[in-house]
Every structure is written in C-alpha cells, then in structure tokens.
C-alpha cells in the first residue's frame, strides 16, 4: 500500500477504513489520516471515528485515498460500503483493497479457529471482485498483487486473550512453529506447484504510480504480517536463510521471490 500512500499530496486526506487501531503508520506523513471502524480499538488512536462503513459521516469527494486493508470480508453491507467508498473518495483519488481468498488454507484455518472470524463475505476471484469495485466506485482497476500468508493471526504473541485449544494443533502458535510452517509451505508451492502459502490479493484502483510491483512477495512477517520484496531485505543469517522484518524486527526465514 506504500505505493499509493506516496501519491498523496501534502495536505491531503486519507481514509483507513475498517482498520481497528490502524493498518499503517503515517510516520513523517504530510497528509491527514482518519481511522474508521465499527468498534472502538481499545487503545487511543488519533483521528479515530466510530462509524459504519455503509454510512460514512464525511462529505462527498473528501479523501485523496482510501485504504480497506482486510476489511471488506467483514462488512455486512458490502454493496453499501463500496458505494460509500465511491462517494467519499475523489474522482482523481486512489483506492487500495486487500482481501483473503476464501478457498485458501489460510482463510480456512482462520475461520475454523476463530469460528468464522467475522468473515461474512467470501471472495474466490480477484477479477470478479475488481470488476464489482470498479463499477461501484468508478475508479479504474490498475493492478492486482497476490498475497502470501505468514499465519500471523496464529502467533500467540499477538493474542491478548487465552488462545483457543485448537491452536495447539498448530504448535501452539509459537514463533518457531510458524517459522517452520511458512517456510515448508513456500517450498511446497515452489517445487510442487501448490497454493498452500497463498492467502489473497491486493487490488489497486484509481490514481496509482506508473509501475506497481504485482509480483508475489513471499517474505511476510510471522509477527506483524507485513510483506517485503526479497531484493530489499538484508539477510542476517545464511543458514538457515533469515532476515529481520524491517517493520517490527522479528526474525523470519528468507525465500527468494524470483525462484
């Protein structure tokens, strides 16, 4: 999503929709960020507005960019939410959407462990979803990037409440178990052509840079879930190949995107 953030002019306005405590950090940003969610995040969040995505309390054409990062699958009124996004974003603005593919192992695990996990909308085709969003928001679809999993939602360090008993079937959510699981799935995908580490898609609409990296980033942090292209990572170990996440510093096993 950093590609679209870079297009926002100084003094602009950005909407982080369905974000909880926030899906990105506007460090050093020269634009304003408004965070919106149906439920309060439980911690202080600057410029937080509690609202329904299908009834946004903002004037038309107010935002230069809208980010819906893993939130469309949670909206009960998906059509209404998309119409509202189209209303509040400028015609010259941009939109970033990321969603899970409900046919993947990762989304199945998420819904099984979390007893649905709030996923009321299921998506199985990036092309179909892009067409719906483009038609509703009037923003042109410019790129789609496949997303890999890190199982960060299984990480016991990310849980405040007691983890479900089912989690012990997957190593208890320890970082060691997640390191091994993600690395093995990446290798199976590479050598056997499976889709076990595939998670979903990131879709870009509207005013986007001329070149968006639409390749699959296989290095996704097991703690914070942020993805990074392999050619921008500094390996700290040769065997096993490993890097530290630039966002949170967690040690992850490294895979080459181009292999």
What do the predicted segments below correspond to?
Residues 54-55, 73, 87:
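Glycine-/small-residue-rich active-site loops that bind phosphorylated ligands and cofactors
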Residues 61-62, 92:
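Short acidic capping loops at alpha-helix termini that bridge into adjacent secondary structure
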Residues 13, 92-94:
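Short glycine-centered segments of the SAM/dcSAM-binding site in methyltransferase folds
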Residues 9, 75-76, 89-91:
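Helix-to-beta-strand junctions that scaffold the AdoMet/dcAdoMet cofactor pocket
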Residues 1-59, 65-68, 82, 198-201, ...:
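Conserved N-terminal segment of class I S-adenosyl-L-methionine
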Residues 22, 71, 147-149:
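Flexible loop residues that form catalytic
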Residues 76-80, 84, 94-243, 250:
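S-adenosyl-L-methionine-dependent methyltransferase catalytic module, highlighting the catalytic core
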Residues 65-77:
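A short SAM/SAH-binding and catalytic strip from SAM-dependent methyltransferases
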């Amino acid at each position: 999503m950093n590609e679209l953030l870079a297009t926002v002019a100084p003094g602009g306005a950005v909407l982080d929709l369905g974000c909880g405590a926030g899906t990105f950090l506007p460090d050093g940003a020269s634009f304003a960020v408004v965070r919106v969610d149906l439920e309060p995040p439980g911690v202080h969040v600057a410029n937080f507005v509690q609202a329904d995505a299908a009834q946004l309390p903002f004037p038309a054409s107010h935002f230069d960019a809208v980010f819906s990062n893993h939130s469309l699958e949670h909206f009960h009124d998906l059509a209404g939410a998309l119409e509202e996004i189209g209303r509040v974003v400028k015609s010259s603005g941009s939109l970033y959407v990321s969603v899970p593919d409900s046919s993947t192992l990762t989304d199945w695990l998420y819904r099984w462990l979390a007893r649905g996990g709030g996923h009321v909308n299921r998506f199985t085709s990036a092309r179909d979803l892009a067409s719906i969003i483009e038609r509703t928001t009037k923003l042109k679809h410019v790129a789609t990037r496949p997303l890999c999993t890190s199982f960060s939602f299984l990480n016991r360090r990310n849980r405040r409440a007691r983890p479900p008993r089912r989690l012990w079937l997957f190593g208890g959510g320890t970082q060691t178990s997640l390191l091994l699981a993600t690395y093995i799935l990446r290798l199976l995908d590479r050598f056997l052509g499976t889709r076990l580490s595939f998670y979903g898609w990131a879709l870009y609409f509207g005013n986007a840079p001329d070149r968006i990296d639409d390749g699959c980033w296989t290095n996704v942090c097991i703690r914070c879930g942020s993805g990074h292209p392999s050619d921008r990572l500094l390996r700290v170990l040769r065997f096993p190949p490993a890097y530290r996440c630039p966002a949170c510093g967690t040690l992850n096993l490294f895979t080459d995107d181009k292999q």
